[in-house]
Amino acid sequence: MTRLALLACCLLFMTGCSSTRHVPQGEYLLDKSTITVEDAPEVQAKSLQNYLRQVPNHKVLGFARLQLGVYNMSGRDSSKWYNRWVRRLGEAPVIYDDALTEQSARQLRLAMINRGYSNVVIDIDTTVNAAKRKTRVNYRVRPGSPQVLRNVRYTITDTMLRRIVFDDTASISLKSGGLFDRNMLDAERSRLTALMRNNGYYTFAKEHITFIADTAAGSRDVDLELVLCAPKPAIPGDTAEATRHRRYFIRNVYINTEADAPASARLDTIMSRGYHIIYGPSRYLRPSILDEKCYLNSGQLYSATNVDRTYEALTQLGILKYVNIAFTPAGKMPDGDEMIDAHIMLSRGKTQGIMLELEGTNSEGDLGVGAGITYQHRNLAKHSELLTVKIRGSYESLSGNLEGLINNRYTEMGAEVGISFPKFEAPILKKRYRQRVKASTEFNFTFNHQERPEYTRIIAGAGMKYKWNNRMNTRRRTFDLIDINFVYLPKSTIDFINTIAPTNPLLRYSYEDHFIMRMGYTFYKTNRPPLFNTSAHNNISQPDIYTFRMQAEMAGNLLYLISNATGMKRHDGAYKVFGIQYAQY
């Protein structure tokens, strides 16, 4: 309760500072900016917020401008380092600017025109509070008459391309009755381009798709024609070559694990599962892991998605510094389609690393020292496994009255060993399923020995877990196959626990002997788009972001079944492991 009160006081102090403290005389703080859309219920005002060129300072919890409050805690003398430091922590006040307001209005008008509205008018309503030196701005959007698609026609002379397009009619977004939205036109162009490039058309580009819009004077109806153009010939005037788009098939896949090797280096090429793998003397990656991480295969129709998935899977391997994929022509097929060779170039990073930490302490004259070392091996068994070993120790002497205590010093020794595999370590899973997700398998072992004046405590643990995500990282799952936590206090003073945790059961439990062997599952889902999935139209509104997290676990049930089946004796009405009662829930 005391912490909440202290936090509330801090919030009141920061927000209580004058918000116009650093607003120059004659200027106004932009206090609020809103958008009102009239006579167009289908347009949400919040979808237009990204077009504003000036917005007020950010509010926390919808009412407190904490960052502005921090900035206002600084003095007016910007030559002092303290004032500059405080200002960097906060956010400068947003000063109302007529030019930016006009620019925002122009951007809103252009956005509405692109969405299919004509005769768009943007009115700016400004309310000035001279006493408080603040300004509020409201943009009133009057969309005018919407332009509606009356007819939509796809002109595709190539029968194979036409079949690909109309086999996926459910994804077509341009339909009669919809708005003549320029953003939707570009989205449809991008969708069709991706569709073609995933069906073998390696050289297909957005420029091969054009739109012809026919609008009658005085009418809001639009007849739209999408034209899928033939490719331009490499030789001007060669009409035979320009008759149709060519499909591309992968002839061979070459994986060069020594992309940085000099031309004089001795390299060997082996065939493994259809791949030409080029190795140096070390052969630092086994063929099996390359096979699992590669989505390109000989004889396969070119697919841009498979190229992206190969990039993502290979960059997951910590031993690799960078990955590059290129394609080269490899001749023609009898039917006129093309063949290409895939060249996957891998550059090796550092295999091992070590980090040392040192620290010294002085607590009321009691000197102490601590040291830690971390060792990493990024390719333990040539599958890009990550081995991490951490060892840490600390010591602090004690002075003064030590009567009634069991130790005359603070000491701590700990070790942690973790191994992470960049795939599912489960032989029953087929390659097809393992390639559908980004997965890892983790093992960890921990041990910590503590000596304090009041107690000696041993903490140990071990675990194995699986983690897997979908490609877009919007769904994440963690399955703790086993997680063991062991706490044992061989020595402690008589009233130690009652002294430190008289009313806190959780803190008390952490200082009592216990053994937990649990199994758990965690599911996480969000609609937040990944950072790399940015649209060409950054101002297109995104849906409200949500996250969902679910966790379930159980502990002790397997131990109980084993104890019951083997006839183990109960102690004080409960089963024990290593003389310690285990948790069950």
Protein language model regions, located:
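Sec-dependent signal peptide recognition
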Residues: 2-7
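Soluble periplasmic/extracytoplasmic beta-strand elements of cell-envelope proteins
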Residues: 111, 121-123, 136-142, 155, ...
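Amphipathic hydrophobic-ligand
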Residues: 117-122, 202-206, 367-371, 518, ...
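Short, flexible loop/turn elements at secondary-structure junctions
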Residues: 126, 143-145, 230-232, 329, ...
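Transmembrane beta-strand segments of outer-membrane beta-barrel domains in Gram-negative
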Residues: 198, 353, 402-585
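Outer-membrane beta-barrel initiation region
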Residues: 238-434, 510-517, 525-542
